[in-house]
């Protein structure tokens, strides 16, 4: 909504639409991403391939929340820009967008950390959550 009335409306509106489309795609992917993990966990505990299959499934299942964190960070940054430069009557909408995007980035980052415990993907997800956090602060004027 805030993108419809700002000086940067055309590019912001277009990018927001692209991000919305990607977020919806990722939500659909995320619905099914954990199924292979559950299947691997159902293998007998003494199966020699169980640990490797669980690990591989968790790594793969972490890709969609990582991408969700990436999209959410960009949404938060776009919302922060709109909060600062957009139509003053819609600043609240932009701030709400930044807050929601930051929450999505944090949640997605936590899912990655839960699945993988540590490593470069966890660090990347945490960095994306921090980007969203900084954007939220900018949107709030902090």
Tell where the protein language model's regions lie, with residue ranges:
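C-terminal auxiliary extensions adjacent to catalytic cores
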Residues: 108-142
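A structural-propensity feature for long, helix-poor, extended segments
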Residues: 2-43, 136
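Amphipathic alpha-helix face/heptad-repeat signature
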Residues: 12, 19-22, 26, 61-71, ...
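Amphipathic alpha-helical interface segments
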Residues: 30-99, 103-109, 115
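Acidic-enriched, low-complexity/disordered segments with a strong bias for Aspartate over Glutamate
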Residues: 7-10, 46-47, 77, 93, ...
């Amino acid at each position: 909504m805030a993108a419809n009335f700002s000086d940067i409306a055309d590019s912001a509106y277009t990018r927001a639409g692209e991000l919305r489309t990607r977020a919806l795609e990722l939500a659909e992917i995320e619905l099914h991403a954990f199924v292979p993990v559950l299947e691997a966990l159902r293998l007998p505990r003494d199966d020699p391939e169980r640990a490797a299959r669980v690990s591989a499934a968790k790594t793969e299942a972490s890709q969609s929340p990582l991408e969700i964190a990436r999209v959410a960070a960009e949404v938060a940054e776009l919302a922060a820009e709109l909060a600062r430069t957009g139509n003053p009557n819609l600043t609240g909408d932009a701030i709400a967008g930044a807050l929601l995007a930051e929450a999505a980035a944090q949640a997605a980052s936590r899912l990655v950390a839960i699945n993988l415990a540590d490593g470069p993907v966890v660090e990347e997800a945490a960095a994306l959550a921090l980007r969203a956090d900084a954007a939220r602060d900018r949107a709030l004027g902090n």
